[in-house]
Amino acid sequence: MNRRIISAAAVGLALSVTNTPVAAADKVEEKGDVGQYVDLQPVGLPVVSNGRLVNYVFVYVRVNLTSAANVSRLREKEPFFRDALVRAGHRMPFNSPSDLGKIDAPRLIATLSRDAAIITGPGQIRSVVVISQTPRRRLVAPPA
């Protein structure tokens, strides 16, 4: 009888130690900024060669936010990010001159970073990442 009580107490003590708030807080600290980003809906950007529209490239973009940013408020601004990207892509296409199936990612990142900082305010944007690019058609660059 005493053995049962002692073993039940030992099991209860072991379970209570693993479910403490301190252990849960350690797990949260390991993850860091979980969910501190805004994923943009896919955007079709034009590819222009010799003044003619030859293709579209669908781009998936993620805007990474700082830990001080209000994520829910900035996720509501996702249409503004897409609008800025589409306007910039039509003003001066981001296509790579060597490959008509790719976008010049560094130029897109620089442009969207600048526009996103204007949309959100200073100190809210950590980085912009192009997750993937999918061309509508596979094309080869025209001979020079």
What spans do the regions from the language model cover?
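Flexible, low-complexity charged segments
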Residues: 1-144
